[in-house]
Amino acid sequence: MHYIFHDRGERETLKPLSWTRPVADLRVGVTTLREKWSLRSPGSTFSYHSAAYLAGSFDLSQPEGDAVRHVRGCLVATNALVDAVASLRSGQQLVDAKGEWLASHGADAAENVVFADSVLLMRRPFDLFSANSEVLEADFDLLTRGRSSAPLSGTNTLIGDRIFAEEGAVAEASVLNSRTGAIYLAAGSEIMEGSLVRGALALGEGSQLKLGSKIYGATTIGPGSKV
């Protein structure tokens, strides 16, 4: 499957975040919007229908074919959505209960297929924050299902059972409380001594929480960040 993610009107409503990237490359929960589709559709490829000036950094190619699906970039993927999009026949478009376009098989699709389940659309910057807790929990389940966490140092106080560390994640002498939300530590991330974390938290690859940090409420820290 090849997904083409369309910015549509959300390119304007998500500014300034969308100045430097396509809408589907924005992060909510643990992963970007695009990665949520890729994780649920292994082996898939993707490109973007976005501003021309982004072509130097992002693939803006527009291939055609039976395996190509056009997807609204601000749409948060679920297993049911991925299945519904994959099932579209040529000329069909997936719409929500209000008739809003979600995806299509073919750029000029006109036959509506209604997706009855509720959907999450990241239309404005505040949507990324208000939906972060819900999406982070879903991402955590997807990323950790059937897997075991890498061990964390015995110097930590770990509360709850929704703490997952990828290989190479490090935490020392800190308190991690997952009873209020999942805590996901990506590869190479680090929580320095004396930090207090009350989930939910997604700490990106190579990111750091500095000495004595206090984190609470659903928080996403992207790759390579220092807090």
Segments and roles (model prediction):
Residues M1-D161, G168:
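Terminal amphipathic alpha-helical/low-complexity segments used for targeting or macromolecular assembly
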Residues P151-V227:
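Structural signal for interior beta-strand "rungs" in well-ordered beta-sheet cores
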